A protein has these predicted regions:
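Conserved PLP-anchoring active-site segment centered on the Schiff-base-forming lysine
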Residues: 87-108, 113, 120, 126
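Short, conserved active-site loop motifs that form the nucleotide-linked donor/cofactor pocket
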Residues: 71, 156, 181
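Conserved core segment of the aminotransferase class I/II
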Residues: 182-210
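Conserved beta-loop-alpha segment that forms the PLP phosphate-binding cup at the N-terminus of a helix
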Residues: 54, 68-93
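N-terminal "arm"/small-domain region of PLP-dependent enzymes with the aminotransferase-like
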Residues: 1-50
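Active-site phosphate-binding strand-loop segment of PLP-dependent enzymes
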Residues: 117-168
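Short glycine-rich anion-binding loops that position phosphate/pyrophosphate groups of nucleotides
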Residues: 26-29, 77, 100, 138-141, ...
């Protein structure tokens, strides 16, 4: 039972300083709801533990029509980004703004040199054939989507975060994969599975086996 004494719901009509909510996060500040969810989870065995992942692999690969041997599932897109960056050998990672805020954090943790750039700067980059580039396309921050495949041969690794592509797939590369391309997707946005932490990446068999 939840003790409701000294608990008040926030007044959402008032501006609260330093509470930033954007489209790249799935957060809320309703502590009553948080406690209720904890109570439900504590009293049920439903959706508490991860099951065997073979059915999930089959379901994802059948839905997106991609080969299972080139697919890896993970605990959301964040986990997969970290794993991909741990598995590739590059001189530098160019991160196209606006971007997911954890990419540079992982670069620091792993020891990868990185640089933030704008989309219109890519064509002028020189000698980047030993480097990688990271896009969020479509972009959940500014709502833009671009045809980026023309930049693919310029880089050693071409990493595309397509967590929003189920909403707009005109520029998705999931059906135009190449050996240097990595597609990262999440089920948290289109299916609302943020709490379950489910994502997958699609790339070369060598990378997936890493």
């Amino acid at each position: 039972m939840i003790n409701k004494k000294n608990i008040e719901r926030p007044d959402w009509t008032k501006l609260i300083k330093h509470k930033k909510i954007d489209l790249t996060k799935n957060v809320h500040h309703d502590h009553i709801l948080n406690e209720k969810i904890k109570e439900i989870i504590a009293n049920t065995g439903f959706l508490v533990n991860y099951a065997n992942d073979s059915d999930l692999y089959i379901a994802i690969c059948n839905y997106y029509k991609i080969p299972i041997e080139r697919t890896a599932i993970g605990f959301g897109a964040t986990d997969l980004i970290h794993r991909v960056l741990n598995s590739i050998d590059i001189d530098c990672l160019y991160i196209v703004n606006p971007t997911f805020m954890m990419v540079d954090v992982y670069c620091k943790m792993i020891g990868i040199k990185y640089k933030f750039i704008e989309l219109n700067e890519i064509e002028n980059l020189k000698e980047v054939n030993k480097s990688g580039i990271y896009f969020v396309n479509p972009n959940g921050v500014n709502g833009e989507a671009h045809d980026i495949k023309k930049y693919r041969e310029k880089f050693k690794w071409f990493i595309v975060d397509e967590v929003y592509s189920d909403f707009y797939d005109s520029y998705s590369l999931i059906n135009e994969i190449s050996d240097n391309t990595v597609i990262i997707k999440s089920l948290s946005k289109s299916l609302g599975f943020a709490g379950l932490r489910v994502g997958f990446c699609y790339g070369s068999t060598d990378l997936i086996n890493e």
